[in-house]
Each structure stands twice: as C-alpha cells, then as structure tokens.
Amino acid sequence: MAAIQTKHGFLEYEVMDASSRWKQPSETVLFHHGVGIDMDIWIDWLPYLSTKFRCVRFDMRGCGRSSIPPESDTWSMEEMMSDVLTVADAVDADQFHLIGESIGGTISLYTALNAPDRVTTVTALSTGHRGNYINQVGNWRNTVEQEGFAAWTTKMMEHRFYPGAVADEVYNWFSMTQAKSSPHATLALGELLMAQDLSKDLDKLANPVLLIHPDSSPFLPVSMSAEIHSLLPNSELMVIPHAKHAIACSHAKEASAAFLNFISRCH
C-alpha cells in the first residue's frame, strides 16, 4: 500500500502485477470504485487481470483509507479526474485502461472525455451519465438526517445485492465497510453525481468503451445504459441478468472475462 499527496489530502493506492517478468512491460489497468466502499471491491478481479496487466486500485477521496475532506470542501468532477490522473502519474502510467463502477464509472467517462490521450479504454459498470434520471440518490440526505446513517446503509445493501448473490462473508465485509464510510463524503458524492449530465459530450468520446450493466439496479434502469451506448461512437453493452447494483463485487468473474474479451478485440 502506498499514498500520494494531493491538495485535498492523501490518496491510498495499491499496485499488483503478477505478469511474467520476461515479457514486455504490462499495460496498466486503473480501477475506480463507487460510493460507500473502497478499493477492495475489486479484489476478486485481480486473479483474472493481474497476470496480464499491472492493476492499480485506489481509495477514492473521502473513502476507505484516503483522506476525508472537511464538510466545507468543494467536490467537482474536475477534482475527481485530477485524483485519477494523480494516481496514474504516481505509478508512471502515461496511458491506462480505466475501469469504474457507479460514480467511478461516471468519473471514468468524464476523464476519458477530458484526457483522451491518457485513457486507452473505459469499462463502466452500473454507470449513469445524467443525474436527473438516477433513482433513489436524491433521497439520501433525508434518509441520513431523519433516520441515521445506519438506516441508509441497510437500504443500500438491499439495493446492491439480491439475497444470495454473494457469500455471507463478502456481504458482511461490504456492509461493514459501507457502515464505516464518511456520511458527509457519501452525501457529497451522491449530490455530485446528481448534478452531472454528460449526454451532450459523449458523442465526442472516441475511445473504446465497454458498458456492463445489471438488469435490476434500483438506481439505474437498463435504458440509461442503453442511452449511453447509443450516444457513444465506439461502445459495447453487456447486461447481466438477475443482478442489482453492485455487480463489480457480485459478478467479478463475468465482468473480468468481458473486459478481457473486449480488450482482445478492440486494442
């Protein structure tokens, strides 16, 4: 585990590269998690990807082991993109494949739009592009203020997984990690997401994009991912059946295989 300093505090990151040392240097995959969780949501991707790529995971600002900004701090997509590029610079990744889930997917699309020379491909899971079409998130602040953060956590777990979608120990880890997340950072990220509208810019994104979407996210209907797919000039869409929002965790094997297949054909 390592850390890089930014003007908003430090970002914790980790690099795993199990590729053969006698081959060409591995390309870099940079993972960006979503709200209320940390870099370990990607842990089950590593057995599939780390033998082929240098895998870089980090805890998003306000999450996990990274610094939690004060409540007065301003959150913006520009700053979130800056965090991505800061981590990439720290590991000397001039170019990288960017994999993001939920708001991490939205930030990934934004980064590819604004730094296309840095991002080789984007893989976006459970991702929205228009905040006004995202369900549930607009109620987060009321839930936290009126019922408490524990109530928010309980509702979120219902939205993330169908019963039995992950092993009990995975479910418990996810729930405990989410319960320890910063309430004010969580709300700030939700409100940042709700303020976004990338729809007018997506046709300018020439980089290859793979969209992986659950069929039953309580936040984002499949039609939203289909709209993103229709706006992007170079994209593919995969829908995972009988899955709620947290497919980065519940369907790591399937999503990793889809990423590897996508890369083999487009890169």
Each PLM stretch: what is its role?
Residues 78-96:
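Conserved acidic catalytic loop of the alpha/beta-hydrolase fold
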Residues 205, 211-213:
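Short beta-strand/loop motif that positions the catalytic acidic residue
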Residues 216-220:
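Acidic catalytic loop of the alpha/beta-hydrolase fold
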Residues 235-267:
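Catalytic active-site module of serine/aspartate enzymes centered on a nucleophile-bearing elbow/loop
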Residues 9-69:
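Conserved HGGG/HGGXW glycine-rich cap/lid loop of the alpha/beta-hydrolase fold
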Residues 132-135, 146-203:
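Conserved alpha/beta-hydrolase catalytic His-Asp/Glu region
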Residues 106-114, 118-148:
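Flexible "cap/lid" loop of the alpha/beta hydrolase fold
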Residues 33-35, 96, 100-102:
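Conserved alpha/beta-hydrolase "nucleophile elbow" surrounding the catalytic nucleophile
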